[in-house]
Amino acid sequence: MIIATAGHVDHGKTTLLQAITGVNADRLPEEKKRGMTIDLGYAYWPQPDGRVPGFIDVPGHEKFLSNMLAGVGGIDHALLVVACDDGVMAQTREHLAILQLTGNPMLTVALTKADRVDEARVDEVERQVKEVLREYGFAEAKLFITAATEGRGMDALREHLLQLPEREHASQHSFRLAIDRAFTVKGAGLVVTGTALSGEVKVGDSLWLTGVNKPMRVRALHAQNQPTETANAGQRIALNIAGDAEKEQINRGDWLLADVPPEPFTRVIVELQTHTPLTQWQPLHIHHAASHVTGRVSLLEDNLAELVFDTPLWLADNDRLVLRDISARNTLAGARVVMLNPPRRGKRKPEYLQWLASLARAQSDADALSVHLERGAVNLADFAWARQLNGEGMRELLQQPGYIQAGYSLLNAPVAARWQRKILDTLATYHEQHRDEPGPGRERLRRMALPMEDEALVLLLIEKMRESGDIHSHHGWLHLPDHKAGFSEEQQAIWQKAEPLFGDEPWWVRDLAKETGTDEQAMRLTLRQAAQQGIITAIVKDRYYRNDRIVEFANMIRDLDQECGSTCAADFRDRLGVGRKLAIQILEYFDRIGFTRRRGNDHLLRDALLFPEK
C-alpha cells in the first residue's frame, strides 16, 4: 500500500512521516539543509505481520509542484497535512484539487503543530479544514490532531493508517511502471524505481524500457523497500535491470512495460473535470504519472475534449492527467483518457460525439469492447494495449458469445450481418453487370464489397456464407444461389460442336472458333456461358480448360506443397509437362482465385477447400 502526503510547504509533512515511520524522507542534501522537500522522498513502515506500508513525501512548495504530481500517480491513499498555526493555505487547496482530479484516493487528514497554538485555534482550523474538504468532495475524510514532537495524536493516526484497506489490483492487467528515479548500485548495476500502475513483475521477467526502446531483464526486485521475487501494482518498486542501457539514458517519465508498446500518442480523447473553464486550443502543462509535457486542448461537447501533446505520451484508457495553465501556476482541470489515437477528421459529427459519450460511460473492459465493436472491427492488439490487458484478461473477455474473430481482429454479430448484406448486394450487382461471367473470386469480391475493412475478417465472412449456402462457389468463382446461366439455341449448337474438342489441353477462343468454323465473338460468348455453368474455366482471358483438369492441377499443387512446402513454376511445369508460359498462367489463375498466394517465385497453398481433394 502506498500513501502520498499532501499539503502546503512547511506544514510538517516530512516531520510527521518521521514520527510515524522513524525515517526522514528528505533524501537530497539541499532538502535537509533547507528543511523543505524539493523532490519525491520515500519512507517505509514495516509491520510485524509482514505488511510494509509505504509513504511518498511530495513537495509542498508551488515551485516544485511538478515533482508532487509525479508522486500521486498509482497511489491508494493520501495523507493531507495542515499546520494548526497557518491553517488552510494555497497549496492545501491545490493539492486537494490535484487529488480530486487524479481519481479521488481515500484521504486522511492530519492537523500538525497543535503544540504551537491554543485549543481555540485548533478548533478554528479543524472547522476550516472540514469546510474545504466538503468543497473538494472529501467530506468523509478522517481527521486527526497531532503534535509530532511530543507524540500527541500519533498512536491514533498510526492505528488508523494500519487499518486502511489495500486497493485490489486486477491480475488480468499487464505490468506497467512509471520511472521516477534511476541510479547505479555498486556490485548490482542499474536500478530504476517507480510506482507500478498495473500488473505483476517477477525476477527474470523481460520488460520493455521506453526512451531507449530496448528489452531489459529483471535481475532483482525490492517492493516497499523489501527484497522480493514478485512485485505488484500499488507498490513502490525498485528494479535492478540488465540490458543495453545506461543511467544517463533514463529519464523521469520513461516506462517499464510488460509488452513492446505501440508508438506513443500525440492525440487522445479525454473526459474533463474542470475547476476553471478551459478555452478552445488553450496551451497547457499536462502531467501524467511521472511525465510532464505541454500541449493544447480542443473542446468537443459537454465534458469531452481532445488533448494534443507537443511531446508524445504512452497512455492507456482511464489514465488520469492533470492540466495546468501554461505559466504552470494554476491547476485548471483533470482529464481521464477515453480513447487513444482518435481520427483526425469527423470528431464533431453528432453520431460520433454520441458514440464517444457512450465510450466514456463504459464501466468495464467488456463494456468498452462492446462500444468499440458498434463502429466496426476492433484490432485486439490495440485494444489489449488500451485496456492494459494481458493474455489471461483477453482470453476471458473473448469468451463471450457472438464475436467473430480472425487473427487479431474482432467483429460483433450486428456489424457482421451488415457486412454480409453488403457482400450479397455487391455480388448481385456484379451478376447484373456481368451476366455472362460466373462471378468474382474471393479476393475480388472482398475488394469490391468492403475494401477498407479487415481483410481476414471479410474473407472469413465470405467463407461462412459459402458454408451456409448464402453464396455458392464453382472452382473459385463465387455466385448467388439463383445465378444460373443457360445456352441460347445458337449457343447450344455452337457448344455441341466445341465440347467434343475439349481434351486435356486448353483452347484459345480464336483457335476453337476457327476449328469449328464459328464466328469468334459468338464462340467467346458461348464459352463464357459454359464457364458460368461450371463446365470449363478460363485461366486467362479467352483461354479455357475443362474443369476436371483444373481440379487435377489443384491436386498437383497440393502434392507439391506437401513435398516442397510450396510450388514454383519450374516444378509445376515439369510435373504437368507443358511450357513455362502455360504453367505460369495456370499458377497465376490459382493465385487470383485465392487457392494459392504468391511469395517471390513460390506459390503457397492458401485455401485448400476451394477444390475437392482427389
UniProtKB/Swiss-Prot annotation:
Keyword Protein biosynthesis found: yes
Gene Ontology CC, one term: cytoplasm
Domain called tr-type G: residue spans: 1-173
Renumbered residue ranges of the record's region G4: 112-115
Annotated spans, G1: 7-14
InterPro entries associated with the record: EFTu-like_2, eIF2G, Elong_fac_SelB-wing-hlx_typ-2, G_TR_CS, P-loop_NTPase, SelB_WH_3rd, SelB_WHD4, SelB_WND1
SUPFAM superfamilies, sorted: EF-Tu/eEF-1alpha/eIF2-gamma C-terminal domain (SSF50465), P-loop containing nucleoside triphosphate hydrolases (SSF52540), Translation proteins (SSF50447), Winged helix' DNA-binding domain (SSF46785)
Additional remark text: There are about 1100 copies of SelB per E.coli cell.
Role this protein plays: Translation factor necessary for the incorporation of selenocysteine into proteins. It probably replaces EF-Tu for the insertion of selenocysteine directed by the UGA codon. SelB binds GTP and GDP.
Family: Belongs to the TRAFAC class translation factor GTPase superfamily. Classic translation factor GTPase family. SelB subfamily.
Protein name stated in the entry: Selenocysteine-specific elongation factor
Lineage: Bacteria, Pseudomonadati, Pseudomonadota, Gammaproteobacteria, Enterobacterales
